[in-house]
Amino acid sequence: MKNKTGKKVLYYAILAILLGVFCFSGYQIYSYYSEQNASTSLNEEIVREYTIRKTGEAKEYFEVDFDQLRQQNEDVTAWLYLPDSVINYPVLQHGDNDYYLTRQIDGSYNKNGSIFMDYRNASDFSDRNTIIYGHHM
């Protein structure tokens, strides 16, 4: 009888642990996708508000209103765009490379962070090499 009670307790303890792991994993997955969605939405809003699409002789291009964009965040230094891809982001630069690892352009926390330039580089791209970081974009 004692052996059956011990097995039952062990069974429920393992079940509770597995249920806890399942719930924690579900929360982590939800958190990841929620932040990814927030990051994507903010970037789409920035692109919509601060860029103007134009067509030229050979290709479609756009202009960025840096003056208005810098009113929102003075750390904006450039815009990174690759045609026919999803890469279309403002490039930020701060005195600490860790700052934009987990922050959006509006300063809000987000695990995805932002595209940012190394703090040691000149913001006018006059260096021989410029390092640009981007994580989970």
Predicted regions and their residues:
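N-terminal Sec-pathway targeting helices
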Residues: K2-L18
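Solvent-exposed, non-transmembrane regions of membrane-associated and secreted proteins
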Residues: L18-M137
